[in-house]
Amino acid sequence: MTGTIPSNSQDPDLVLSARPSAHGRFGRFGGQYVPETLIPALTELEQAAATAWKDESFTKELTQLLKTYVGRETPLYEATRLTKHYERGTVGPRIWLKREDLNHTGAHKINNALGQALLAIRMGKKRIIAETGAGQHGVATATVCARFGLECIIYMGQEDMRRQSLNVFRMKLLGAKVRPVTAGTATLKDATSEAIRDWVTNVETTHYILGSVAGPHPYPMLVRDFHAVIGEEAKKQCLEAFGRSPDVLLACVGGGSNAMGLFHPFIEDRSVRMIGVEAAGDGVHTGRHAATITEGRIGVLHGAMSLLLQDSNGQVQEAHSISAGLDYPGVGPEHSYLKEIGRAEYAAVTDQEALSALQLLSEKEGIIPALETAHALAFLEKLCPTLSSGKEIVINCSGRGDKDVNTVAEKLKTKN
């Protein structure tokens, strides 16, 4: 969709394009705000992706690896006991989980990491860098680099390394070099900044596997397209399970890749509500949160114009969340666009609400979700009472919670 759509358009007949404008924009969001040294690399990446998607050998190899290496397709699971929990008498929606936690490496992240690794090989780039917050993208990137024999360097904030020590060990075990970032808040924003600095310095030999639908064009489109397999599978599985599209899609949003992967194939179906759930941290009113769409203003971060958490001087504010994967002060530009035109809805839940949701799913379904996923699950408390029987909710279970067990144990110990 080009930038011809007016700001805050609520046109119900709006048809959304699969591609941003020629300048990499979704409405007024997106673009390429990067040093000139990176423009050739971004152009090369966009052209390589466009060529690859038209190449049957590329799509065949990607599809085969997604099946035999990643373990796709992932199930659409009917959460019967969770559904029962939210019933009012016998009234309430039915809840389904799209089980991305069952992918190799335990999250959705490998869909994108695998696709970009194949592109890097096509471009002749043998050195790979990536940023990571919760560690899942770092593990996924280290995994595909091991699979293809590529050099791998992961940038991770020191605070996130403390919170996600298990994933740090996994990355090292897979042969990656994990470089701690101590600048700023020592979290995802700072790790991303360091990765971009590395890329500027080594652009001729290095490909940056960016882990979310953020950053300069073509990354928001590229990452979304590699994750769209989530929604494509879900659409087919919903038809098989209950004969139609779901009424509501629900996914957590930090940068927003798992949500865009689920949402994208449904965007033109106006009968489907799409709800992204951000991290309210200690509460939006406290200032200690990562609710970018809920509270942010337009600005530029990491190469793209989008909604950002900013102070009165336009400086990027620190984000806070119990979830390292949502602890980011920006969001992908397509999410900002979907919010502005009224196609998607966004809400925020607190750390405590996410913890409670993690415990609930664990006890009701025997599935321990990632803290990121738990934010989407927590919104069921507000959503389910508004829906009648016969409504179908699909939640993207974006990752498993093994990595978060220590954090959860500490919080519950403190609480008790």
Swiss-Prot record:
As stated in the Swiss-Prot or TrEMBL entry, residues carrying the post-translational modification N6-(pyridoxal phosphate)lysine are K109
Q: What is its EC number?
A: 4.2.1.20
Q: What is the lineage of its organism?
A: Bacteria, Bacillati, Cyanobacteriota, Cyanophyceae, Synechococcales
User: What species does this protein belong to?
Assistant: Prochlorococcus marinus (strain SARG / CCMP1375 / SS120)
The GO terms describing molecular function are: tryptophan synthase activity
Key words, A-Z: Amino-acid biosynthesis, Aromatic amino acid biosynthesis, Lyase, Pyridoxal phosphate, Tryptophan biosynthesis
Q: Which InterPro entries match?
A: Trp_synth_b_CS, Trp_synth_beta, Trp_synth_beta/beta-like, TrpB-like_PALP, TrpB-like_PALP_sf
- Fetch the HAMAP family from UniProt: Trp_synth_beta
User: What's the protein here called?
Assistant: Tryptophan synthase beta chain
Q: Which NCBIfam families match?
A: trpB (TIGR00263)
